[in-house]
UniProtKB/Swiss-Prot annotation:
The lineage of its organism: Eukaryota, Viridiplantae, Streptophyta, Embryophyta, Tracheophyta. Heme b binds at H200. It comes from the Eukaryota. This is Peroxidase 54. It comes from Arabidopsis thaliana (Mouse-ear cress). It catalyses: 2 a phenolic donor + H2O2 = 2 a phenolic radical donor + 2 H2O. The gene is PER54. It is found in: Secreted; Vacuole.
Amino acid sequence: MAVTSSSSTCDGFFIISLIVIVSSLFGTSSAQLNATFYSGTCPNASAIVRSTIQQALQSDARIGGSLIRLHFHDCFVNGCDGSLLLDDTSSIQSEKNAPANANSTRGFNVVDSIKTALENACPGIVSCSDILALASEASVSLAGGPSWTVLLGRRDGLTANLSGANSSLPSPFEGLNNITSKFVAVGLKTTDVVSLSGAHTFGRGQCVTFNNRLFNFNGTGNPDPTLNSTLLSSLQQLCPQNGSNTGITNLDLSTPDAFDNNYFTNLQSNNGLLQSDQELFSNTGSATVPIVNSFASNQTLFFEAFVQSMIKMGNISPLTGSSGEIRQDCKVVNGQSSATEAGDIQLQSDGPVSVADM
C-alpha cells in the first residue's frame, strides 16, 4: 500500500468540540465512552493496534478498507458490540453467514493478531468492539487520511444477530433511498451516507459487486447509462458477460491506496465503481449531489465530515458498564468454543457498503 504520512486536517479544537457534541447526541450509554478509557489499564492500546496494522499492510495493501468495513458491518447490526466477529456455535448463528458478509468480509485474521498482541500486553482489558474502532482510525490515518481521537469503553456482545445482518446492511445494488433509510434507522443522516461512502477512496471491489451495471442494467439489456464509457469498456474486459465474476479492481481509479477526496471527483466524471457510489451524484435532485460537490472541491471539508460520521457510527448502541463482556478471543463468547474454524474469506468489496443477494 502506498502509505503516506497522515496529514490530519482536523485541528485539536475541532476534535475536542466534536467529541463533546457527538457524546451529547447519543444518550447515557454513549456518553460513557471516552478517549482516555484505557489510559490507566492499557496505555499503549492504540499504538499496538496501529503497529499490527502497519505490519499487515506490508503484505495486504487493501486491509485498511477491509477493517473499516468490519467496523461498519458490526455497528449496523446490534450496535458496535463486536457481534460480527463471533463464529457459529451450538447457540449462536454467526453474522458472518449473512449474504452481506459471506464470501465478502475479510480481515478477521488481523483482528485476531491485534487481540493477541493486546492480550499479551494487558490481558482482559481491551474489547474486540474497541479494536474495530481503533483499527478503523489507524487504517485511515496510515493511508494519509485524517486522524481522530477514538472514544473507547465499548464492551463485547454475548450473541450475534443473523436476521439483523440479513436486513440491516446496505447493498451496492440498492437504490439511494433504500440505503439512506438504513442509515436513518441507526441514527445517521444523509451527510453520513455520503461521507462514510467516501471510505471507498481506498480498497477493492470484485466483479460481482458491479457487473449488474455492465451489460443488462435493471433489465434494460444495456449498460448503466451513468457509467463512464471508457471505464465501462475496461470493466467489461475485466468482467466478461457470463464470466466467473472473480476479477478485482480498485474502488478509486485514480489513487487506489490513498485516503483522499478523489472518490468524489470520480463520481463527478461518472467513474464511480458501484451503483450505490454513482447514485450519490447521478440521482438528479438528490440531497447527496451538493454534498458530493462540496467534498470533491474541498478535501478538508470531507475529512472533517468523515471524522464526525465515524464517531457517530462508533456510538451506535454500545454496551458499556457491566453489560456484555471483554472477550478473550474475538471469535467466541468467553467460556464457549466455536463450531467452525475462523479464517479470512475471499474479498468482494472493501469499504462501508456491503455485498448482498449473493
